[in-house]
Amino acid sequence: MPFSRRDFITSTLASSVAVGFSKDALAQESAENKQTTKRAAKLPIIICAANGYNYLNDAYAFLAGGGDTLDAALKVVQGPENDPNDESVGLGGHPNEEGVVELDACCMHGPTRTAGSVGGVRNIKNVSLLSNTVRRHTGHVMLVGEGAERFAVAQGFQRENLLTDKSRKEWLLWKETHSDWWGPGLDNPDWRQRYSGATHASEWDRRIQRMEQVAADIGIPPELRMDAIRCVIFPPTGTIHCSALNAKNEISGCTTTSGLAWKIPGRVGDSPIIGAGCYTDQDVGSAGATGNGEENIKVAGAHTIVENMRHGMSPLDAGMDALKRIVRNYNGDKERLQFVDMIYYILRKDGAYAAVSLWTGYEVNKPHQVAVHDGTRRLENAVSLYSGASQSWPPIRMLR
């Protein structure tokens, strides 16, 4: 349902107050993190990011019928990859700053203890399947860029234009009105020079009116303009991870993404990194991530979580520990952490599972969720370390 400029301003200011300008609120850990880890009612079980919810039924039926765990997980993530309306993966994914879609993916097959990965792939839609092809048909683990694309074509994958008209127009809107990735990052002492966000409704209104004018000139339909503006101001970091466990306690996982919207060409995030965006150990369990890839790489999040479980932590505690390592990298500085978010999806080989996030959600009243199917398909809220909504990096700046 389209939302108005007033709705956008109200929700944005609410997020700023909850995260950017209320240190007391920021310092409070979510009461939800006192919850306990949940356990599947029965095996098999599949867990994934919320954008995989619509694809769980077929994958679960396949898994329950004796299908391979990795094949089941791949069935889930192919759904968003094939959906042009899901702009976080595959076809229709948001492009880099030059308007080119670059995709990343990895997979791990627990029963055979093998892995495959691809990064910076152009013109190939189902990079999750491509990562599995690397796993099955090469002696390598990771292929990137042009080499990965050539390998895909040699293996029978079809080249296709992944940039939809909708994503192209959103990229044009970003190109004309917003910022780029050149300049200091959050871990640079000079990070503040990039932070001059608006905090008053009148300033937001001026900015958004200007962006609406540009959106109209570009040809974005009226009912889609506020959605496009949101994508520009808050660059999506969407991804999908999926882990699947069968009745024999065999487990596998995979992660696929189009990466951070408007990224510098060649940027590779955590999704294709074995041990960051995805990690599976047949003896322990599986974990994956969505959110700020750079921060997850620094803590090797998925590997950290699985190793925590190996040493006796519950899925919930293992995930919270990984989040706290991200917090430690910024010495607990909430002024910078407001620009970071991370969601971990965790499945232990006995069917215990959890989903944890650094912040409640990208909006205060819309918590991060995990999709689960153990005979009953459902969405559950992630357990957050901190209450409040995160913001995107780079921060909002004055429009040109």
Task: Give the role of each language-model region.
Residues 22-27:
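Boundary at the C-terminal end of the N-terminal hydrophobic targeting segment
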